C-alpha cells in the first residue's frame, strides 16, 4: 500500500531522461571522426571524377535523361489519345442516336400521310380507289 501511495505522488512530476553534458575535448569521438572522414572522402572522389569525365559523357548522360522525360510525355500523349478516342466514340454514339430519331420521325410522318391518303372517302363513303391502287403499286415497286 505504501508503494501505491508513493506512485500517486510521482504522477505530478514526469521522469526525466539521462542528462547529457558536453563531452570534453580529450573524450573518445572516434565514430564521429570516422563518419566525417568518410563524407570528406566521398566528396573528394566525386570532385575528382567530375574533373576527369569528358564533356561527351555528360551529353550522353543528359540525353538519357531526356529520353526518359520523353517517355513520360509519350505516356501523357497516350492518355490524351485514349481520351480523344473515348470522346470520338461518344460523339459517334450521339450522332447515331440523332440519326435514328430522325429516321423514326420520318417513318411516322410517312405512315400518317399514307393513313390519311388511304382513309379518304367519296361523298357516298366509298374509299377512293386511285389512292388504294397507287399505294399497292408503290409497294410492288419497292419490293422489286
UniProtKB/Swiss-Prot annotation:
Biased composition (Polar residues): 1-11
Biological process terms in GO annotation: maturation of SSU-rRNA
Basic and acidic residues bias locations: 75-114
Entry superkingdom: Eukaryota
GO CC annotation terms, alphabetical: nucleolus
UniProt KW keywords: Coiled coil, Nucleus, Ribosome biogenesis, rRNA processing
Keyword Ribonucleoprotein attributed: no
Annotated InterPro entries: Fyv7/TAP26, Fyv7_fungi
Protein's UniProt keywords contain Cytoplasm: no
Regions annotated as coiled coil: 72-124
Main location as per UniProt: nucleus
Pfam (any one): rRNA_processing
Localization of this protein: Nucleus, Nucleolus
Region of interest called Disordered, as start-end residue ranges on this chain: 1-33, 62-132
Similarity comment: family membership: Belongs to the FYV7 family.
Function as written in the Swiss-Prot or TrEMBL entry: Involved in the processing of the 20S pre-rRNA.
Full protein name: rRNA-processing protein fyv7
Source species: Schizosaccharomyces pombe (strain 972 / ATCC 24843)
Taxonomic lineage: Eukaryota, Fungi, Dikarya, Ascomycota, Taphrinomycotina
Gene: fyv7
Amino acid at each position: 500500500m505504501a508503494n501505491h501511495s508513493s506512485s500517486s505522488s510521482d504522477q505530478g512530476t514526469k521522469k526525466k531522461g539521462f542528462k547529457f553534458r558536453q563531452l570534453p575535448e580529450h573524450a573518445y569521438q572516434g565514430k564521429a571522426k570516422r563518419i566525417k572522414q568518410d563524407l570528406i572522402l566521398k566528396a573528394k572522389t566525386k570532385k575528382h571524377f567530375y574533373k576527369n569525365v569528358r564533356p561527351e559523357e555528360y551529353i550522353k548522360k543528359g540525353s538519357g535523361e531526356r529520353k526518359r522525360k520523353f517517355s513520360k510525355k509519350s505516356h501523357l500523349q497516350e492518355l490524351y489519345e485514349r481520351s480523344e478516342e473515348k470522346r470520338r466514340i461518344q460523339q459517334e454514339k450521339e450522332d447515331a442516336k440523332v440519326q435514328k430519331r430522325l429516321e423514326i420521325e420520318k417513318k411516322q410522318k410517312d405512315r400518317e400521310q399514307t393513313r390519311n391518303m388511304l382513309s379518304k372517302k367519296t361523298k357516298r363513303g366509298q374509299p377512293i380507289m386511285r389512292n388504294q391502287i397507287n399505294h399497292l403499286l408503290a409497294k410492288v415497286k419497292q419490293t422489286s
